[in-house]
Amino acid sequence: MAKAISLEEIKNETVDLEKIPIEEVFEQLKCTREGLSADEGASRLQIFGPNKLEEKNESKILKFLGFMWNPLSWVMEAAAVMAIALANGDGKPPDWQDFIGIICLLVINSTISFIEENNAGNAAAALMAGLAPKTKVLRDGRWSEQEAAILVPGDIISVKLGDIIPADARLLEGDPLKIDQSALTGESLPVTKNPGDEVFSGSTCKQGELEAVVIATGVHTFFGKAAHLVDSTNNVGHFQKVLTAIGNFCICSIAIGMLVEIIVMYPIQHRKYRDGIDNLLVLLIGGIPIAMPTVLSVTMAIGSHRLSQQGAITKRMTAIEEMAGMDVLCSDKTGTLTLNKLSVDRNLVEVFAKGVDKEYVLLLAARASRVENQDAIDACMVGMLADPKEARAGIREVHFLPFNPVDKRTALTYIDNNNNWHRASKGAPEQILDLCNAKEDVRRKVHSMMDKYAERGLRSLAVARRTVPEKSKESPGGRWEFVGLLPLFDPPRHDSAETIRRALNLGVNVKMITGDQLAIAKETGRRLGMGTNMYPSASLLGQDKDSAIASLPIEELIEKADGFAGVFPEHKYEIVKKLQERKHIVGMTGDGVNDAPALKKADIGIAVADATDAARGASDIVLTEPGLSVIISAVLTSRAIFQRMKNYTIYAVSITIRIVFGFMFIALIWKYDFSAFMVLIIAILNDGTIMTISKDRVKPSPMPDSWKLKEIFATGVVLGGYQALMTVVFFWAMHDTDFFSDKFGVKSLRNSDEEMMSALYLQVSIISQALIFVTRSRSWSFLERPGMLLVIAFMIAQLVATLIAVYANWAFARVKGCGWGWAGVIWLYSIIFYLPLDIMKFAIRYILSGKAWNNLLDNKTAFTTKKDYGKEEREAQWALAQRTLHGLQPPEATNLFNEKNSYRELSEIAEQAKRRAEMARLRELHTLKGHVESVVKLKGLDIETIQQHYTV
């Protein structure tokens, strides 16, 4: 007998619980197969600690200082050093006011970043707590689902298909498990674990179900020890690369401006040393978008919180930008497009065995089901009985074989009242037919019934039985007999059809990926209005392709298909891979352990509600509510978040260009030295205003969106260049002419550099901040209502700027108030030259889209002799495309959507077709039948479904 040791010694690992016999494990851990009591579990938790890895607590001070350690902050810090080190010349003291101002700007920016990120981090931690792994544990003699963190050595847990093992444990009696240990050992194939073997925390159960006794938790597990040996890797994501590219563009623009100033001011113009340094400081301070990392990270954090409120928890923050760009969604049918609430029509049950009625077929199916911890099919089978207890009435359960994706069936070995042994099995018809080694006539009859069911959108479930004369659960038993076929109806969700229509309008192509038969997939697709261009999974391997699509390569077939049927997990992975090769941003939904590779491969892996731990672990977004509508809502929210970030980046690039080139030309042409301190005031007011962009109301992009750096830089350069030019023109009119004095009766500022400084400051401040209203809107800026917070922040900032320009009298900043008359003139000037900004924005977008060149070179629109610019051809192409997409006509070898035809043109044709259909509908209203059908169509009801399932 093993020497008894204390729990403290077990914690210190003085005994090797992995190698000793299982009975000694119970003895050493002072526990039984009945599990621990709740009190004992709580006391052991004090000894062993929670079952999770130690979290590194980052210093708050270091985290705060970290916000000052990035390339954009380095430039500002270099400017601060310049203000006191290099600006100490020409008999003037160091530029302390600019130094203090720069430090204040950095501290303000870091404080806002720290507070917002801390709040977002707390919110994210609360959300992720909801995703904390759960496990089935035996406490006080009852099985219950608990958080894995409460597990202690000695607990009895249940491990089933799809579970991530929550702690190191030894397996108890039962069938062997298949365990995927690739995350720990790198083994690519699942390993077989027999009773008595150890399973490691972090590995995944791929097949089987078994109980186990916990022997190590938290940092004492194999996974916990390994985690201490490796440092976390810092992968640079796409979002970080975009930030770096935009930051580098701004820094390079500033560097070019500074280089030009240095070359012109010192060797050519022979300016004073200190004047040159002051001008360089203006470009450095004003050009750097110091708030960019803060604004973008806060925007993403707030957006992530909003997504969680809609039922989508983001595990990876940058998944938001990928969700905004998603253009293909591969969706499961069961549970996502349908309710996953199955029912059986007793009248359609088909009996194959002699001396058996339909009720016995249902009873046998219920016996081959779980009575607890059920999935949807088990619950349906047991629920069809008058009393669920009948499933185990008069029999004694010997062994239950749970469902696994390979065998696709469940089975129960049981003993009846006469002490005879039997085995019942239910599962996929093909697997059950092979199990029974059915004759050809039986197979033909089964396939015929399956086709009839499928035409009505019904899935098939087969039932078989056999006797076990050897009276042993390991014995093969007698020959399997095919007993019957059951039709399962899984009704579509009430909102699926409308959601799919919304998805198509948003430019997201929804493809149904299902393991069901092709006929079921087509019928579901027809009911949901997503098309009937469905193909069997065999077509992905180049087999069983329809003659109409035989010439299509696999990639093109996947792209054009509305969905695939009879799909296995490896097919899902292949579908995602091929779509990505065609440059699509792909989303994939999944719920099972075998979906994990496809979820990992997809740009956005989406674990649906009630997904297994393995699917959640592989996904980027976890849904807390069922259905497709949650995903589409998340797409819209993601696009709104992305739009805010994109709006800000265009604004940041524009401001850099306008500050750098505006002040550079003024400094070089007129040798006028703008005050670096006043640029600091502009930067501080700008940052305060721009922080509100993270909560701005925006109109999401109507199509999938992504980081188009070419568009961001082009728009920023053009808008910023225009603003710089308007500032230069304003300064010329104020400095060299009496235009404003003559036209508006204000005093001339030509002889007062200090008053000109105030006027120039106000003009730059107004037009710089007003630009955000242009970059935030897709159409005319005055038609899209901004968020109230942004409007209030803008008004406060510009009120402060106007008061400074009117009343300030700061000798250190060379500023003197210019009066209310000039303030009014500057506001009028800014408003007049603000108006063309929208037109320029539209022009840039139009040129970059390529439509301008297409119209000019390809369509020759300006010189065409066709009436209505070839409208008839476009309508014909649209009609052909629609007929093909909905299975009414096979596709031709030629490209259906000629690339010359823009999305907008096709949309216009679609709108015209809708209007004609609406007119026809209104004419139908004159008949009673037409009125009833029209109302039904308007409410989105399916008349055929109503007729099938409801009778009077």
From Swiss-Prot:
Cellular localisation: Cell membrane
Source superkingdom: Eukaryota
Record's bilayer topology term: Multi-pass membrane protein
Transmembrane spans: 65-84, 97-117, 247-267, 278-299, 647-668, 674-696, 713-733, 755-775, 788-808, 818-838
Binding, Mg(2+): D591, D595
GO process terms (BP): proton export across plasma membrane
Catalyses which reaction(s): ATP + H2O + H(+)(in) = ADP + phosphate + 2 H(+)(out)
NCBIfam families referenced in this protein's UniProt entry, alphabetically: ATPase-IIIA_H, ATPase_P-type
Name assigned to this protein: Plasma membrane ATPase 4
Native species: Nicotiana plumbaginifolia
Gene: PMA4
